[in-house]
């Protein structure tokens, strides 16, 4: 009866051409009329899911997360931010709907110290001085249950591992794409032995490494199976594994969004204690002993951030920017500088500026690609611009693809002075249709007047096609030996990368080279060739957007088709949650 009323209501409203927002509110009204207000509140999860399906919001991460297993956390947030059921429509609908404030568009401002020194544009580092070599790994996503021969194309976003559907496929002899001996591109994560093979290759071919940066996301994409116990185990296991291959090399980790339990959800301390992430930070503090200064353990164990003076005149800052993750639902309660991480960053940069030190920042989530809350991304942008003379390296991950991002003196004007470049390194995991890869930077070394800027970098990748075909004789290959030579750069400075974007507008050879490296030459990337101007403009616009504004792309004629995002980690629970929900008669719609 209730379902019939809903269908009739939607059909009638469709003839009147009312908005989806009004349809959504009508559904809530009908449910309240049928159930009563108390039951409507009790069944808010089921209403949310029904709204998601009815209005096809499957591509909205907010909606997809709701139907996961983590209803306790979600319900706490909902009770804090929703006063009336109508506001659920305001939360879920992409358009303006009701009086609920869209957390994805909320802007707030940090107080940033004045007295900024005159900006000194970065110059190409002259040759002849000592250099440092730094390894950059990101998005390891190691799957301890990866099983050779299981279905790699299993129909869910996480394959190559034992699960009901996969086992049934194997037993019936219906395997379309067996999981390869060394990994499988697509919906599979990193086998542990692929990780160790990579580390062995680096140890034997890279020469002396001065330090290693790991920009987060250690665990697999099996988000429904996340627990504090499994995450703590993986933090220790993978930290110990890296240490075993590089016992004398310091390693500096950053917190990734997949370190959250639930995924993406790093709870600030304004939430009840049972949701706090102290267990994660303590596990990291224990696993990273010897790499983290004793005086930074308190900071690490509070909000996942720390600083270390790694050389005379150079500091490493590990910033936990999952506190800016757009899918961290705790931030929908209050996203203004959670746990004081950005104020902590300001304090660290001010201390460095006061004594003339340079700073490298290792973090996980770039401010672009719609992955960060705009308020957080814009505040971070302004902080880095304030300390543009101090920050000489930013090393991120998360996107799985190889990218760079420009920062400008005016965050909304690509014609203003380029101030910084952000490096987003390629992932180790083949998940999201890329071959595994890693990067090694050459950096201006320890000497009087060192800039500690990146001079150049090389990139290596693992061709899963050829290596799975010859599994007893695998090899890592050089994707390119020098980024400067590959892209015709005079050096790793903002003006050169800004000019590279300009050149790629018309230089087909240069753009195609960048596009191929972005995909690590993977023929499995599932994307159509980028042969038209709209596609090209999407990549060029991406490189300018370290926060979300189209004002940085107004000169790109012919339209913009943004690159496809990486695979949606939430859809893994979509079908199973639907099936589980159908059995809930007490809230059945």
From Swiss-Prot:
<feature type="glycosylation site" description="N-linked (GlcNAc...) asparagine">
    <location>
        <position position="237"/>
    </location>
</feature>
<dbReference type="InterPro" id="IPR041805">
    <property type="entry name" value="ASMase/PPN1_MPP"/>
</dbReference>
<feature type="disulfide bond">
    <location>
        <begin position="24"/>
        <end position="89"/>
    </location>
</feature>
<dbReference type="GO" id="GO:0006685">
    <property type="term" value="P:sphingomyelin catabolic process"/>
</dbReference>
<keyword id="KW-0862">Zinc</keyword>
<feature type="signal peptide">
    <location>
        <begin position="1"/>
        <end position="17"/>
    </location>
</feature>
<keyword id="KW-0326">Glycosidase</keyword>
<feature type="region of interest" description="Disordered">
    <location>
        <begin position="562"/>
        <end position="589"/>
    </location>
</feature>
<dbReference type="Pfam" id="PF00149">
    <property type="entry name" value="Metallophos"/>
</dbReference>
<dbReference type="GO" id="GO:0061750">
    <property type="term" value="F:acid sphingomyelin phosphodiesterase activity"/>
</dbReference>
<dbReference type="InterPro" id="IPR004843">
    <property type="entry name" value="Calcineurin-like_PHP_ApaH"/>
</dbReference>
<feature type="glycosylation site" description="N-linked (GlcNAc...) asparagine">
    <location>
        <position position="334"/>
    </location>
</feature>
<feature type="binding site">
    <location>
        <position position="364"/>
    </location>
    <ligand>
        <name>Zn(2+) 2</name>
    </ligand>
</feature>
<dbReference type="GO" id="GO:0005764">
    <property type="term" value="C:lysosome"/>
</dbReference>
<feature type="compositionally biased region" description="Basic and acidic residues">
    <location>
        <begin position="578"/>
        <end position="589"/>
    </location>
</feature>
<keyword id="KW-0746">Sphingolipid metabolism</keyword>
<keyword id="KW-0378">Hydrolase</keyword>
<dbReference type="InterPro" id="IPR029052">
    <property type="entry name" value="Metallo-depent_PP-like"/>
</dbReference>
<comment type="pathway">
    <text>Lipid metabolism; sphingolipid metabolism.</text>
</comment>
<feature type="disulfide bond">
    <location>
        <begin position="160"/>
        <end position="188"/>
    </location>
</feature>
<feature type="glycosylation site" description="N-linked (GlcNAc...) asparagine">
    <location>
        <position position="109"/>
    </location>
</feature>
<dbReference type="GO" id="GO:0005615">
    <property type="term" value="C:extracellular space"/>
</dbReference>
<keyword id="KW-0325">Glycoprotein</keyword>
<dbReference type="GO" id="GO:1905691">
    <property type="term" value="P:lipid droplet disassembly"/>
</dbReference>
<feature type="disulfide bond">
    <location>
        <begin position="541"/>
        <end position="553"/>
    </location>
</feature>
<keyword id="KW-0443">Lipid metabolism</keyword>
<protein>
    <recommendedName>
        <fullName>Putative sphingomyelin phosphodiesterase asm-3</fullName>
        <ecNumber>3.1.4.12</ecNumber>
    </recommendedName>
</protein>
<feature type="binding site">
    <location>
        <position position="398"/>
    </location>
    <ligand>
        <name>Zn(2+) 2</name>
    </ligand>
</feature>
<feature type="binding site">
    <location>
        <position position="400"/>
    </location>
    <ligand>
        <name>Zn(2+) 1</name>
    </ligand>
</feature>
<feature type="disulfide bond">
    <location>
        <begin position="154"/>
        <end position="159"/>
    </location>
</feature>
<dbReference type="InterPro" id="IPR008139">
    <property type="entry name" value="SaposinB_dom"/>
</dbReference>
<dbReference type="GO" id="GO:0004767">
    <property type="term" value="F:sphingomyelin phosphodiesterase activity"/>
</dbReference>
<feature type="glycosylation site" description="N-linked (GlcNAc...) asparagine">
    <location>
        <position position="463"/>
    </location>
</feature>
<dbReference type="InterPro" id="IPR011001">
    <property type="entry name" value="Saposin-like"/>
</dbReference>
<feature type="binding site">
    <location>
        <position position="139"/>
    </location>
    <ligand>
        <name>Zn(2+) 1</name>
    </ligand>
</feature>
<dbReference type="GO" id="GO:0016020">
    <property type="term" value="C:membrane"/>
</dbReference>
<feature type="disulfide bond">
    <location>
        <begin position="530"/>
        <end position="535"/>
    </location>
</feature>
<dbReference type="GO" id="GO:0005576">
    <property type="term" value="C:extracellular region"/>
</dbReference>
<comment type="similarity">
    <text>Belongs to the acid sphingomyelinase family.</text>
</comment>
<dbReference type="GO" id="GO:0046872">
    <property type="term" value="F:metal ion binding"/>
</dbReference>
<keyword id="KW-0964">Secreted</keyword>
<keyword id="KW-1015">Disulfide bond</keyword>
